[in-house]
Regions:
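Short amphipathic alpha-helical segments with coiled-coil-like heptad repeat character
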Residues: 90-98, 308-312, 491-501, 505-507
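Contiguous, well-ordered alpha-helical segments that form the cores/surfaces of helical PPI scaffolds
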Residues: 293-306, 326, 487
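Glycine-centered flexibility sites
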Residues: 296-299, 407, 490, 500
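Alpha-helix N-cap/helix-initiation sites
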Residues: 290-293, 498
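Conserved catalytic cores of very large enzyme subunits
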Residues: 1-289, 310, 314-473, 477, ...
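Long insertion/accessory domains within large nucleic-acid-processing enzymes
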Residues: 473-512
Length: 512
């Protein structure tokens, strides 16, 4: 039982395409000889490639359906992310094979998965991440066709999300790698050896197999409201709360110390995370940068509004918000130097905790306009969901905060149905490539099982004031008879949400 998300890379599957190719070439040659046909290389290769393509199709489909039909120990679908990065393999046949697997993954997601009524709908998992890079980002580049396919997929199914190789390499010392699940990023590799006994270890390039020890989140809105707008008091309280978070994180770390590899052999002994001996503890994997531990934060927007009286998109608010972020990073640096553990700052998504935090704030401080008057607080450093701002301005503004959130962060833009405007989707993707490390586009992908309506199912108030979902075509409000897919924070949610998150989804303004 493991908390959080795991990521796999299609680059690790790509080498097996050649294994299958050689197998089919041998089979075809044998079959042609058996029926008296001369097995020329051209004939053998053409038939073998048809079979390879069919196998890629079946293999990708199997991954998709296995992920959505599996259940974790707490009854959830596994939080799996699939990473699609062409430059992870050398140029040539291997990269072309990887491109073929990526292409099929995108085709399968565009198609969707069948529900009980036989209708293709948007699945929540696996989450897909597509890396924007020099040979796929502009028309005329070799893999531009994949980027166009990714844009089509995003417009219909809300994935993939996008990592800019160019920006990530600037921020991560020349490295580009996947996050762990939704948004949690490892620190740049500083390990001093092959601690995990990996069979493919490359010094300075260790990312797969590393992990996170846990996260504790600081509610910045509570710190602000507790200060009574006294700036000196705010910084004093922030340091006190940081110390509380530090002690909680150390408890998480100590809870893992002494854990024998036998508790989860597939993780610790068989190579998913490490290849430790039976009975060996995981302790050495908790230090020297092998794993990370996260200081989370939430509500920077409301914190700034309370302390400065303006949004953090205003110059005065931005200056204060960036100062808060730098203090949080300084704390992580202090703790890292003290313990040789990679503490890192993480933009907490608050999938459902947003409602709990908001209700606690209202109970403690009452309703404060623009601060505690919603049943949610804003995810990490994000611009408030109700604030009018263009997609490009939002991404550019948030990029400076993403740089200060090295342990994890993702930005998004809210867009209408873009299936008939893929040029606009591509324009946003190209802007992401040039300006921000990690971002996504949010659209709507819903289906009513009562009337067959496909479009946006609306959020309305019932007679008691509760937020409910309603089909605009037939008025159906039965959640068991509709399929609703919305971006919760980084993952796509399909199981509906609490009242706080539902209000946040309802109030999102379009950025494009």
């Amino acid at each position: 039982s493991q908390y959080g998300g795991q990521s796999i890379s299609l680059s690790h599957l790509a080498p097996f395409v050649q294994v299958s190719r050689e197998k089919y070439r041998k089979q075809v040659r044998t079959e042609l000889e058996a029926i008296g046909v001369t097995p020329t290389e051209d004939k053998v290769n053409k038939i073998a490639e048809i079979r390879v393509k069919e196998e890629i199709n079946r293999g990708v489909q199997m991954i998709q359906y296995q992920v959505i039909t599996l259940m974790t120990t707490n009854g959830q679908a596994p939080f799996i992310t699939v990473f699609m990065y062409l430059d992870e393999v050398p140029e040539g046949q291997l990269r072309d094979d990887l491109a073929a697997v990526i292409e099929e993954m995108l085709h399968q997601r565009i198609l969707g998965v069948k529900n009980e009524q036989g209708v293709y709908i948007t699945p929540a998992f696996p989450k897909l991440i597509y890396v924007l890079e020099a040979d796929n980002i502009r028309e005329g580049t070799k893999y531009w066709y994949l980027t166009k396919l990714a844009a089509e997929c995003t417009a219909k199914r809300m994935v993939p999300d996008y990592i800019s190789e160019k920006i990530m390499k600037k921020l991560k010392d020349g490295n580009c790698y996947t996050c762990m699940g939704c948004r949690s990023f490892l620190t740049v590799d500083r390990t001093k050896g092959n601690y995990a006994n990996a069979k493919n270890y490359v010094p300075g390039k260790k990312y797969y197999g590393r992990f996170n020890q846990g996260v504790v989140t600081l509610n910045l809105v509570d710190v602000a409201c507790s200060s009574g707008k006294d700036m000196d008091k705010f910084w004093e309280l922030l340091d006190e709360r940081l110390d509380l978070c530090y002690r909680a994180l150390i408890i998480r770390h100590k809870r893992l110390l002494g854990t024998p590899s036998d508790v989860a052999p597939i993780l610790w002994q068989n190579g998913a995370l490490a290849r430790l001996k039976k009975g060996e503890t995981i302790d050495k994997l908790l230090y020297d940068g092998y794993s990370t531990i996260s200081l989370g934060y939430a509500g920077l927007c409301e914190c700034t509004r309370y302390m400065k009286g303006v949004s953090h998109t205003e110059p005065e608010g931005t200056e204060f918000a960036l100062k808060v972020m730098r203090r949080l990073n300084d704390a992580c640096t202090e703790w890292k130097e003290k313990h040789n553990i990679d503490f890192s700052l993480y933009g907490t998504p608050l999938e459902s905790t947003t409602y709990k935090f908001a209700k606690c704030l209202q109970k403690r401080f009452g309703i404060i306009s623009g601060v505690t008057d919603k049943n949610y607080i804003t995810n990490s450093y994000h611009v408030h969901v109700t604030e009018e701002i263009s997609a490009f301005d939002k991404l550019k503004f948030e990029s400076q905060f993403q740089e200060l959130s090295p342990g994890g962060a993702i930005s998004y833009v809210e867009v209408p149905n873009m299936q008939n405007n893929l040029d606009a989707v591509l324009a946003v993707m190209q802007y992401i490539y040039d300006n921000i490390m990690y971002a996504e586009l949010n659209t709507k992908s819903d289906y009513c099982m009562e009337c067959g309506y496909s479009g946006e199912i609306k959020i309305v108030n019932d007679k008691d004031g509760k937020l409910v979902w309603e089909c605009p075509n037939c008025g159906n409000r039965d959640q068991n008879k509709m399929s609703v897919a919305r971006r919760t924070c980084g993952y796509i949610g399909t199981q509906f949400w609490n009242q706080g998150r539902t209000q946040e989804i309802k109030e999102r303004v379009l950025h494009l």
